[in-house]
């Protein structure tokens, strides 16, 4: 079970809301979010309701302002607790519909360019565990939560383009 607390002001000040489950619409609980404390679990925050918009991956820890989670603004409108999995496996493809060169990962990868020799992924298949895909190397840029399943095109995971720089397993549950 996870626990996250959202604060309207920086430095864990102002009105706050404590959460332990997925929420598709946080707007009734606070108008802005400038700091977050994750007591347990791994969470994906979304800028828009219904798990849409920019995504931000947070694990246990304190985030005294939204820049700490690489946020572009103080807008957090939905959140999802990411389930813990024991093993992780993902396949990435250079073309849509699982065509072209394929590479499989079971560990984090800070630079797809170094391992895969290109930085555009058009389809993927998450076989085990949850992953976070990052637009840039070294776990920077836009983030996308990938749960087990098939993603035939980059639009399926919410991306505007096929650029992928790095990927990380979701592991820190406690």
Curated annotation (Swiss-Prot):
Detected in the superior olivary complex and fibers of the ventral aoustic stria of the auditory hindbrain. SUPFAM superfamilies: gamma-Crystallin-like. Gene3D superfamilies: Crystallins (2.60.20.10). Residues 84-87 are annotated as: Connecting peptide. GO terms for biological process: cellular response to reactive oxygen species; eye development; lens development in camera-type eye; lens fiber cell differentiation; response to peptide hormone; visual perception. The keyword Nuclease does not apply. There are six different gamma crystallins identified in rat lens. Keywords: Eye lens protein, Repeat. GO terms for cellular component: cytoplasm; nucleus. It comes from Rattus norvegicus (Rat). InterPro entries: Beta/Gamma-Crystallin (IPR050252), Beta/gamma_crystallin (IPR001064), G_crystallin-like (IPR011024). Crystallins are the dominant structural components of the vertebrate eye lens. The gene is Crygd. One of its GO terms (molecular function) is structural constituent of eye lens. This is Gamma-crystallin D. It comes from the Eukaryota. Has a two-domain beta-structure, folded into four very similar Greek key motifs.
């Amino acid at each position: 079970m996870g626990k996250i607390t959202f604060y309207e002001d920086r430095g864990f000040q102002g009105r706050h809301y404590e959460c332990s489950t997925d929420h598709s619409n946080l707007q009734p609980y606070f108008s802005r979010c400038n700091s977050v404390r994750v007591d347990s679990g791994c969470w994906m925050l979304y800028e828009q309701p219904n798990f849409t918009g920019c995504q931000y991956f947070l694990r246990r820890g304190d985030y005294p302002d939204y820049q700490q989670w690489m946020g572009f603004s103080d807008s957090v409108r939905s959140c999802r607790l990411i389930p813990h999995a024991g093993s992780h496996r993902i396949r990435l493809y250079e073309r849509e519909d699982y065509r072209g060169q394929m590479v499989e990962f079971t560990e984090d990868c800070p630079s797809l360019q170094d391992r895969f020799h290109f930085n555009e992924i058009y389809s993927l298949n998450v076989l085990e565990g949850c992953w976070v895909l990052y637009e840039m190397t070294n776990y920077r840029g836009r983030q996308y939560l990938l749960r087990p399943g098939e993603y035939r095109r980059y639009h399926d995971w919410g991306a505007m383009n096929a650029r992928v720089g790095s990927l990380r397993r979701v592991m820190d549950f406690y």
